Amino acid sequence: MHLNTLSPAPGSHKARKRCGRGIGSGIGKTGGRGHKGQKSRSGGSVRPGFEGGQMPLKQRLPKFGFTSRKSLVRAEVRLHELNLITGDVVDIHALKDAGLITRNIVAVKVMLSGEITRPITLRGIAVTKGAQAAIEAAGGKVEE
């Protein structure tokens, strides 16, 4: 057996359809585009959301809500996610290094979800009452 003699099993690779290469191909002449019209022309199509001049759905519906600016710099971390951090001291830099929060986050709060399996020290991170109790029950502590 040599590299130049290798070939796929018969029938395992279907040949691709060659568009517009004669009527025998099954998709010759118009090449699957139908007859005439804007979408049959080269470069001819309408932008996403265009409804032929009718007022588009996006503009017919009212605006609502907004994005809180606080949500862009604050994050929540679940208690069981702290198990992913290797060190004993957990601060914002450790969370960023572990990939649990993005780099633009400046404030973090730990929520009670799951369980912590080892003692850790939280530094400069807010916690809920339940999460604090769970951390202290595991032998850890929370520092402000």
Swiss-Prot record:
Composition skew (Gly residues), residue ranges: 21-31
Keywords: Ribonucleoprotein, Ribosomal protein, RNA-binding, rRNA-binding
Keyword Transcription in record: no
Region: Disordered, residue numbers: 1-58
GO molecular function, one term: structural constituent of ribosome
Pfam families reported in the protein's UniProt record: Ribosomal_L27A (PF00828)
SUPFAM superfamilies assigned to the protein according to its UniProt record, in alphabetical order: Ribosomal proteins L15p and L18e
Any one Gene Ontology BP term: translation
Entry-linked InterPro entries: Ribosomal_uL15 (IPR030878), Ribosomal_uL15/eL18 (IPR021131), Ribosomal_uL15/eL18_sf (IPR036227), Ribosomal_uL15_bac-type (IPR005749), Ribosomal_uL15_CS (IPR001196)
GO cellular component: cytosolic large ribosomal subunit
Family note: Belongs to the universal ribosomal protein uL15 family.
PANTHER family for this protein: 50S RIBOSOMAL PROTEIN L15, LARGE RIBOSOMAL SUBUNIT PROTEIN UL15M
Quaternary organization: Part of the 50S ribosomal subunit.
Reported function: Binds to the 23S rRNA.
Name under which the protein is recorded: Large ribosomal subunit protein uL15
Organism whose genome encodes this protein: Colwellia psychrerythraea (strain 34H / ATCC BAA-681)
The organism's taxonomic lineage, starting at the top: Bacteria, Pseudomonadati, Pseudomonadota, Gammaproteobacteria, Alteromonadales
Name of the gene: rplO
